[in-house]
Amino acid sequence: LDHTEFLGSTLSEIAYEKAGIIKPGVPVVVGEDLPETRQVFLDKAKENNSQIIFAEDKPEVVNSTMTENYTRLYETVGYGTFEGQLAGECQIKNTNTILHVVPLLLKQGLLPQSYNDKKRITALVREAFSEVSSLTGLMGRWQYAGHRPDIVLDTGHNTGGWAYLGKALQSGNYPQVHVIFGIMADKDIDGVLSFLPQKLHYYFTRDSVARALPPEALRDRAE
């Protein structure tokens, strides 16, 4: 849960606010299907006469692994096998969602007509995923900033993100893992801290903005 002061304190309340982006007659793709939220999205889509697709109902991504080059390899139904520049495990769900969006963009005429060629759109999708950071400027998504030792940057700031990050921090075969960690004071601090693995080395810090939790307070909460 995140931004609860604006969106609500339960998944169904947050889903209701998020569903406000559904526009009349415009298709919508929902990337994550949860029992608490599915009916909320279905009701809003019906109200707006909008086609709704739950990406997890018919997965496009059938397998995904980390490569030796610190990228993520995807095996998909409609786009073959390709590499994604963003290596984090959470990208599997994001990629599956995006691959459901592409056909809808074509159908809605929101991509150039020449992209309707299957070979061309497949090539473009593969290129986009392999160069996503340089094409978009997206940073801090399990981003390798150095090797020997591996240095990884991630902007995970809520329990959803740390459910993935906590596992990822324990998945490598490293004799030691050092974590430099800071968080905003208005986040679910205890919830996030519950996902931090034990027996790692932690260095608590803060951002320069006023919302940041002081490192001393963060250390005390972590203890």
Regions found by a protein language model. Give the residues of each.
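Short, acidic/turn-prone active-site loops that include or flank metal/cofactor-
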Residues: 1-2, 57-59, 181-184, 205-211
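Acidic, Mg2+-coordinating active-site environments of NTP-dependent enzymes
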Residues: 1-75, 95, 99-121
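Nucleotide phosphate-binding/pyrophosphate-handling subdomain across enzymes
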Residues: 1-3, 13, 78-201
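Short, solvent-exposed loop/helix junctions and linker helices
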Residues: 8, 89-92, 212
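Hydrophobic beta-strand segments of well-ordered beta-sheets in folded domains
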Residues: 26-28, 51-52, 176-179, 200-203
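Short beta->alpha linker loops
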Residues: 32-36, 57, 157, 184, ...
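C-terminal helical cap/extension that packs against the catalytic core
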Residues: 34-53, 150-153, 190-223
